[in-house]
From Swiss-Prot:
Keywords tagged on the record: FAD, Flavoprotein, Oxidoreductase
Species this chain originates from: Phaeosphaeria nodorum (strain SN15 / ATCC MYA-4574 / FGSC 10173) (Glume blotch fungus)
InterPro entries membership: FAD-bd_PCMH-like_sf, FAD-bd_PCMH_sub2, FAD-linked_Oxidoreductase
Pathway: Secondary metabolite biosynthesis
The protein, known as: FAD-dependent monooxygenase elcE
Length: 332
């Protein structure tokens, strides 16, 4: 996935130099660039399909304290954010120290009202750069406290661990989550179109216990989508120009089991309508996170080689699975 450092170093999975993996037959292998290379490539983005990963060796780099945090804004400012995000994505050259996510959220706790929570990290350090010019279009947008007495931002200079713990604290109790993703060509107008369709879609669910929807608009400039030419299973290197992608996360309390199929249906319908709208505007794009249709056949073959009985397809629940796919009918 995308990290604070992806503009400089690429997707997180591509930082993995070695996977120690327990296979379905009990063998322990090391998958890397020179040994079990096909398995290494598959695990770089192929999810939980091939074995139990018991150790990971990551490429590392030096990183000091940096500036970042969250800012909170009224939903009425969303078009200002969308235009600023479009310009950020289109910047030439793209600022490799800039990590930004624009998230619009609606939840029971906000009484059914949308709000905006931005995540800004500027990873230049030694020394850090507070309020960099790159983020000025966002930091100039009026902010608001989410609740009386609460801060309207958490911006500061801190270390990576502190920023990670800040976001981890947002998920404090078990919930039922649905995740989805779609990408579009860089367009503030398409960002607004998606918001309007999402708002219409979720209205029937606002009173469900623990309901929350987070729609994150994430930049995907070409220097990230080209992935520095790394070997992985995220699909072909993209040549469709600057993009943004949506990370959709909808949840309710853990007891609301009956909502699963409803959520899946309405989300599929929404994404189909959004894709049709994007096609009309010439903004449809192929990129999908986690994996791509262009790599499914290769992943299927790796699964058959390393897990011929399909144990990790049939006995490990959850996540993206290959077990329902027929090699001969797959599109390439």
């Amino acid at each position: 996935g995308v990290s604070y450092f992806s503009p400089r170093f690429g997707f997180t999975c591509n930082m993995v130099e070695n996977f120690e993996v327990v296979l379905a037959n009990g063998d322990i292998v090391n998958a890397n660039a020179t040994s079990h290379r096909k398995l290494w490539k598959a695990l770089r983005g192929g999810s939980n399909n091939f074995g139990i990963v018991t150790a990971i060796t990551l490429r590392v780099f030096s990183q000091g304290k940096f500036w970042g945090g969250q800012t909170f804004h009224p939903i009425s400012t969303r078009k200002d954010h969308f235009h600023a995000l479009e310009n950020l994505i289109a910047a030439v050259p793209y600022d490799k120290y800039a990590h930004f996510i624009n998230t619009i959220v609606i939840t029971n706790a906000s009484y059914g009202n949308w709000f905006i929570g931005n995540s800004l990290q500027y990873t230049k350090s030694d020394p850090p750069t507070p309020f960099p010019e790159t983020f000025k279009p966002f930091t100039d947008i009026p902010r608001v406290a989410l609740f009386p007495g609460a801060p309207d931002n958490t911006l500061r200079v801190d270390n990576h661990t502190a920023f990670t713990l800040e976001y981890a604290a947002l998920n404090v109790y078990p919930k039922r989550w649905q995740f989805a993703t779609i990408s579009f060509g860089n367009s503030a107008e398409m960002m607004e179109d998606f918001f309007q369709m999402a708002n219409e879609t979720i209205q029937p669910f606002l009173t469900l216990p623990g309901f929350l929807l987070s729609v994150a608009y994430q930049p995907l400039p070409t220097l990230m989508s080209e992935r520095y030419g790394e070997v992985d299973s995220l699909g072909p290197i993209q040549t469709q120009g600057n993009m943004f992608y949506i990370h959709w996360a909808m949840s309710v309390d853990g007891s609301e089991v009956e909502t699963d199929r409803k959520f899946e249906k309405v989300t599929r319908d929404l994404f189909q309508r959004a894709e049709a709208k994007a096609r009309e505007k010439g903004l449809r794009r192929d990129f999908l996170q986690l994996t791509s249709n262009g790599t499914l056949k290769e992943l299927w073959r790796v699964s058959k080689e390393y897990d011929p009985t399909g144990m990790f397809q049939k006995q490990v629940p959850g996540g993206f699975k290959l077990s329902e796919m027929d090699e001969d009918s797959m599109e390439l």
